From Swiss-Prot:
GO terms for molecular function: sulfotransferase activity. It comes from Flaveria bidentis (Coastal plain yellowtops). Pfam families: Sulfotransfer_1. InterPro entries: P-loop_NTPase, Sulfotransferase_dom. It is found in: Cytoplasm. Gene3D superfamilies: P-loop containing nucleotide triphosphate hydrolases. Keywords: Cytoplasm, Transferase. This is Flavonol sulfotransferase-like. One of its GO terms (cellular component) is cytoplasm. Its EC number is 2.8.2.-. Belongs to the sulfotransferase 1 family. The active site is at residue 119. 3'-phosphoadenylyl sulfate binds at residues 59-64, 141, 149, 207, 274-276.
Amino acid sequence: MEEILKTLPQHTCSWLKHKIIMYKYQDFWTSKQLLEGTLMAQQSFKAEPSDVFLCSAPKTGTTWLKALAFAIVTRENFDESTSPLLKKLVHECVPFLERQVEEIEHNRESSSLPLVATHLPYASLPESVIASNCRMVYIYRNIKDVIVSNYHFLREAFKLSMEDAPFEETFEDFYNGNSSYGPYWDHILGYRKASLDMPDKILFLKYEDLKSEPISNVKRLAEFIGYPFSNDEEKAGVIENIINMCSFENLSSLEVNKTRKPKGGMLENRLYYRKGQDGDWKNYFTNEMKEKIDKIMDEKLSGTGLILK
């Protein structure tokens, strides 16, 4: 591993007091630990046609998408009063490809859960994922809110105050493309192109649309991953029950998400639940920052039909 690292470009996050060194592998930035997991997944993971991949860049709605998808596919076994989501962090319910290849394989033997989560760019997914023709769901979000969410998540993870970790520096990292699994625009573009080529295999979900029109988008999600709601379920309010159970307000209020850490984990569960709001960036961005990031996103996403403002 050390020999591989020596050949890769490096970036040190100065705003985190040099506590993170990122390496550029296959045109995206990642940590040493996640690179090790990425290499293992690329070399050994065998996808199945029945798999459903939940794909995202960090801090774009991953936790929410996982919760909704898990509740949808397990609703025959659990309801809003018995779901494992009420007792475990959602990331313990849906395995993460870059860390849990063996657990994913074990799940196939012990349960029928088809869900796998990943932050990998489309071009860096294991070849078996593309070859298997399995379905993927990609969630994306306004980059300005992504920057703010990422800032607070990492700042609190490393126990730094806002004075110790200037927001201006994390903004510059993102603007220059030096973010985890970034550049962010490249991450979006990779999945966007693939979704246009294979619309029946890749569902594009916008975080803000999921917030503003949850019922129609949760129905869309369920149909796409092969677990559509029946007319009886719709009449019985099953969709609304799932939305309420998986809401930020509900999950963030659970004791498990206030005080605990996942088994073997270092981060407190509460770090995954900060605000769950749109537009918090307005409390952090200067006009100059807004203009800079809007300009580069307009340039990068030109012609894609995507709007992230």
